[in-house]
Amino acid sequence: RELKGATGVVAMSSGMAAISNTLFCLSATGKNIVSSRHLFGNTYALIGGTMLRFGVKPKLVDLTNLEEVEAAVDNNTACIFMEIITNPQMEVADIAALADIAHSKNIPLVADTTMIPFTHFDAHALGVDIEVVSSTKYISGGATSIGGLVIDYGMPNFTKRMRQEMLMNFGAYM
């Protein structure tokens, strides 16, 4: 599908490279990331462990409970991160409502769309600002080749920072 509204796309070496580089690009020491407590295991370890060691606090909430999400977002929140369908619990949150909360606080909604083919799902139409996806299944299907994509829907300087800072410093080139 045409990526309507995309202002930039960065190809990464894996889906986890796409997620980790995106979250590190958006956050800094003293910031927090509001996310679901139900995540793909590696993503959970990244947000709840690795990023915590860099001073980025995880706020793991029930994304289907909008009041809980709203209460978790504060002045130090870097973004709301979600999986379109959580893996492995298969929960689905209200994407447009989460986008409304994020935008009311001037922070991006970042969505991992790996569980729904990004070629058939328009996350941007529901308010997603940055889409991350494991493109492995589209490249080879059997993990003989892996990849990830970061799709930017207009975050100021985000694609530029991803290319000039994150790729150069973290080496997730594809």
Show where each model-derived region lies.
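Conserved PLP-enzyme active-site core in the AAT-like
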Residues: G8-M174
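Conserved PLP-binding active-site segment in aminotransferase class I/II-type PLP enzymes
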Residues: R1-E2
